[in-house]
Design a protein with these regions (language model features):
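Multi-pass membrane proteins that catalyze or facilitate reactions on polyprenyl-/lipid-phosphate substrates
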Residues: 1-59, 63, 70-301, 305-450
Length: 450
C-alpha cells in the first residue's frame, strides 16, 4: 500500500468515528479496526495489520490506541499517527469529564445511588471474567507451563498478601522470564496465535507489503523523536512544578501517572492495582468504592479502559481543590487533562520511536520471554484486583459483624448473575453493566439495596 493512497481528511473522519464507537475493550476495538480497515475499506493489508498488532502487544500501554496510532503513522507519517491516537482518546476523555461531574454533583440522589450500587457487582464480575479469559490464554495447562503458573501465584501473593509495590513485581517477573527463556525456553515462548490472527495465522509471516520508507529504523530519527518526546514530558512537568510546586497535586499526578504508563503490560486491569495503591491508599485522591464506580464509567464509555485515570484525576482535582474552592470544575477538568497527557504520551513515543526497533526483535526469545513472564504475573495481579473488588462489593461495611451478617446478599446475587451472563451467556460488557444498573435502581426503589 502506498502511504498517500488514503486521504488525510478521510482518515481523520474514521479515527474520530472510532473514538465514539470504540466500546468493548481492546478486543472489541481491535475487531472494529480490523473489520473496517482491512475487510471493508481495505486501507491496509491483512499482513500489515497483524504485524502492527504484534508491535503493540509487546509494548506497555493500551494496545488498541497504540494500534490506531501505528496505522495512522503507517498511512500518513508522524502527524497521521498523532491524529489517530488523539482522536481515539479525545471523545472518551470529554465524556468521562462530563460523567465525573454528574457523579460528584448528583451521585447522592437516590435513583443515581441505586444505579451505581447495581453497577458495582457487575464491575466485580467483569474483572473475574477478565481473570478467566486472560489466565486461560496466558497460563495454558499447568503441566505445559508450570513456571508461568508459579509466577502468577507468586505475583498474587506479593500484591494481595504482602502488599509489595507493583513495579517490583513487574521487574521480578521480567528477570525470571529472562532466566526462564534460557533454562526452559519452551515454557516462555509466547502463544502462536492471537484473537484476530487465529483464523489467518499465515498472514503473520506472509508479509508481502513493502515497508514504507518512513517506518524503517534510523538512528537520527530515533534520537529526534526521543528528544521531542522528552521535551513534551519535561516542559509541562516543569510548568506544573514552577506554577504549584513539586509537592502539588497536579505535579504529583503527572509524575505518578508517568510511572503508571510505563507499567501497563497486560492492559488496564494489570495497572489498576498500582493506580489504586497510589491514588487511594498513598495520596487519597479518591476512595476505594469510588474507584469501582470509575471503572464502571470507564467500561460504559468508548475508548481505552485505562481512561479510568481521567476519572481518578477529575475526582482528585475536585477533592484537592487544585484551582481553589471557587473553580472546582475547572480544576478537576485540568487534573483530568494532566493525567491523560502523562498517561498516553509514552504510548506515542513507543510507537513513533520504538516501532521499528521492536519489529527488528520480533520472534527473538531473549526479548519475548521476559514479556511472557510479565504477562503471567499480570494474571496474579488481576486476581488480586478481583478479590479487592469482591471484598468491597460484597462486604461494604467490613467483616466486623461476621461473614454472614456482613454479606450484602443482593450484591452477591447480582455479581453471580453478571458473571454467568459474561462467562456462560457471552453477553457484552455494556449490556451487563446497563442491566445491572437498572436492577440496582429497582432494588433500591424497593428498599432492598444500598
Amino acid at each position: 500500500m502506498q502511504t498517500g493512497a488514503v486521504g488525510f481528511s478521510a482518515a481523520l473522519r474514521f479515527w474520530l468515528k472510532l473514538g465514539f464507537i470504540g466500546f468493548g475493550g481492546p478486543a472489541g476495538q481491535i475487531a472494529v479496526m480490523h473489520r473496517e480497515l482491512v475487510e471493508e475499506k481495505r486501507w491496509i493489508s491483512e499482513q500489515r495489520f497483524l504485524h502492527a498488532l504484534n508491535y503493540c502487544m509487546l509494548l506497555p500501554g493500551p494496545e488498541a490506541q497504540q494500534l490506531a496510532t501505528y496505522i495512522g503513522w503507517l498511512l500518513h507519517r508522524t502527524w497521521g499517527g498523532i491524529a489517530a491516537g488523539v482522536l481515539f482518546v479525545l471523545p472518551s476523555l470529554l465524556l468521562l469529564i462530563a460523567l465525573s461531574w454528574v457523579y460528584l454533583v448528583h451521585g447522592q440522589v437516590a435513583w443515581v445511588a441505586g444505579v451505581l450500587w447495581g453497577i458495582k457487582p457487575a464491575v466485580a464480575a467483569i474483572v473475574v471474567h477478565a481473570l478467566l479469559r486472560i489466565g486461560g490464554k496466558t497460563l495454558r495447562h499447568p503441566r505445559q507451563s508450570p513456571l508461568l503458573w508459579a509466577i502468577a501465584l507468586a505475583s498474587f501473593v506479593a500484591l494481595y498478601l504482602l502488599a509489595l509495590p507493583f513495579p517490583a513485581v513487574v521487574l521480578a517477573a521480567a528477570a525470571l522470564g529472562w532466566i526462564g527463556g534460557r533454562v526452559a525456553p519452551a515454557q516462555f515462548s509466547p502463544p502462536a496465535t492471537q484473537a484476530i490472527a487465529a483464523a489467518t495465522a499465515p498472514a503473520l509471516i506472509d508479509d508481502t507489503t513493502p515497508t514504507p520508507a518512513h517506518t524503517r529504523f534510523s538512528r537520527p530519527r530515533l534520537l529526534r523523536v526521543l528528544a521531542v518526546g522528552a521535551a513534551l514530558w519535561l516542559l509541562p512537568m516543569a510548568a506544573l512544578v514552577l506554577w504549584q510546586g513539586w509537592g502539588s497535586t497536579l505535579a504529583t499526578m503527572a509524575w505518578f501517572f508517568t510511572k503508571a504508563a510505563l507499567l501497563t503490560f497486560g492492559g488496564a486491569y494489570a495497572v489498576l492495582p498500582y493506580v489504586y495503591q497510589g491514588a487511594v491508599v498513598e495520596h487519597g485522591w479518591l476512595l476505594g468504592p469510588q474507584m469501582i464506580d470509575g471503572l464502571a464509567l470507564g467500561e460504559t464509555t468508548p475508548g481505552p479502559l485505562i481512561m479510568v485515570v481521567a476519572f481518578v484525576g477529575f475526582l482528585g482535582g475536585w477533592g484537592q481543590q487544585v484551582l481553589g474552592p471557587e473553580q472546582l470544575f475547572l480544576g478537576a477538568a485540568l487534573a483530568a487533562f494532566v493525567v491523560t497527557w502523562f498517561t498516553f504520551l509514552p504510548s506515542f513515543v513507543f510507537i513513533l520511536a520504538g516501532g521499528p526497533l521492536v519489529e527488528s526483535t520480533h520472534g527473538k526469545l531473549h526479548f519475548t520471554a521476559p514479556l511472557t513472564a510479565i504477562t503471567a504475573a499480570v494474571v496474579g495481579v488481576i486476581a488480586s484486583l478481583a478479590l479487592f473488588f469482591l471484598r468491597h462489593v460484597l462486604f461494604p461495611d467490613g467483616l466486623g459483624a461476621g461473614l454472614w451478617m456482613a454479606l450484602d446478599r443482593p450484591a452477591l446475587l447480582l455479581a453471580v448473575a453478571a458473571t454467568l451472563a459474561l462467562v456462560v451467556g457471552k453477553q457484552g460488557v455494556v449490556r451487563v453493566i446497563v442491566l445491572s444498573g437498572l436492577a440496582g435502581w429497582a432494588l433500591q426503589a424497593l428498599g432492598w439495596a444500598g
